[in-house]
Structures are given as C-alpha cells and as structure tokens.
C-alpha cells in the first residue's frame, strides 16, 4: 500500500513536538458510515533494546477471517518518550504497510488517537500518512479524565480533556479493566465507539484486529511464524 511521506523521522524531540502541533490541524473527525468489509489491526513490540517489530493483520469483517499478515523488523533509533510514540514506531509501521496488498477500510492501532496531549497519537499520526480511517485502542490511559464505567460488558463513559470529549472508555469484558478508545483520522468518537464494540467478541477484552496482530508479534518474536 502507498502512503504520503509528510515529514522526516530523524528529528530531535523538540522538533517532533512542533511537527505534531502542525499535523494536528489536518486531522478530520468525521462519522464512519456503514460497516467495513476489511479491517486491519496494528501491533508493535520490541524484541531487543534497539530493535522493533511491526505487524499488520487484515481481517474480513464480520467473520474476522485472516486475509493477510505482513511484518517488518528493524532498528529503532528514536528514544522512548511518552507522547512521541509515532516517531519511535511509525517508520517500522510504514515499511510493513508498503508490503500490504489488501486495502483495509479501517485500521485499528494499539495506541492512542485523539486521546493524546497534543491530540495526535499514533493512530491519528499514521492516519494522515495512509489517508484511511483509523482508531486508537489502548489498554491504559495516556491523557484525559473519565468516570469508571460500571462492571458490565459494553458499559462505557466519555474521556475528557477539560470539557472536550476526546474518546471513550469501554468495559469490553466483565471483571477486566476497560480499554481506551479514541478516533484517529477520518473517524469520529461515536463511530470509533460503535466499531470497537463490534470488533470485540464476547469474553474478550481486546478487539480482534489488535488482539490477533499481537498474537502474531509474539509468534514472530519466538520464531514461530
């Protein structure tokens, strides 16, 4: 798959923040109408201190049948700095993206979207590069305040930055911690909430696209795939 190269990656942190502040102005939070046919999940892990592994899994929806899996392993040069995850993981994701043959309708990232100090988590940032609707799904809160949803499957609450709604917190599995969902690009809050609920099977905490992508990253790290 093609993508737009919007900036250099070899930037110091202070310049990376300036890039984020400029790119955030280009984000479009628009409703996603209808149902997707193909959904991708993205997961990244770090087998070594300076080595990263990116996996993209494309699924048929609503069967969640796996259609394609691509990966890219390579050197990580950007330091770990909260809020600048895209500069650490983005280059590897894009190299994996280039290998992809099946164009997804929606891409789900293991990370943040709008729920970010500068409103540009990895789902938003990469969404601008690939120009496909994206959603960020995180296992923990990076930014914002919320009221804990009740311990009932599919209960939820909004995530706020002051009075602005920046995402939602969804209890996908009773007895488990909620997940943090926010739109990336070409997606809005209500659509991202609706889709992630639909992508999460009963008894699962994590939606199928990123859950399956994570399984493949673990297999690849162990040399099993």
Swiss-Prot record:
GO molecular function: deoxyribonuclease V activity; magnesium ion binding; RNA endonuclease activity, producing 5'-phosphomonoesters; single-stranded RNA binding
GO CC list: cytoplasm
UniProt xrefs under Pfam families: Endonuclease_5
Keywords from the UniProt entry: Cytoplasm, DNA damage, DNA repair, Endonuclease, Hydrolase, Magnesium, Metal-binding, Nuclease
Localization: Cytoplasm
Catalysed reactions, semicolon-separated: Endonucleolytic cleavage at apurinic or apyrimidinic sites to products with a 5'-phosphate
Amino-acid positions noted as binding Mg(2+) in the UniProt annotation, renumbered to this chain: 43, 110
Entry cofactors: Mg(2+)
A GO biological process held by the record: DNA repair
EC number: 3.1.21.7
Site (Interaction with target DNA): 80
Family assignment from sequence similarity: Belongs to the endonuclease V family.
Function text: DNA repair enzyme involved in the repair of deaminated bases. Selectively cleaves double-stranded DNA at the second phosphodiester bond 3' to a deoxyinosine leaving behind the intact lesion on the nicked DNA.
NCBIfam families: endonuc_V_Ttgales (NF041102)
Name of the protein this chain belongs to: Endonuclease V
Name of the gene this protein is made from: nfi
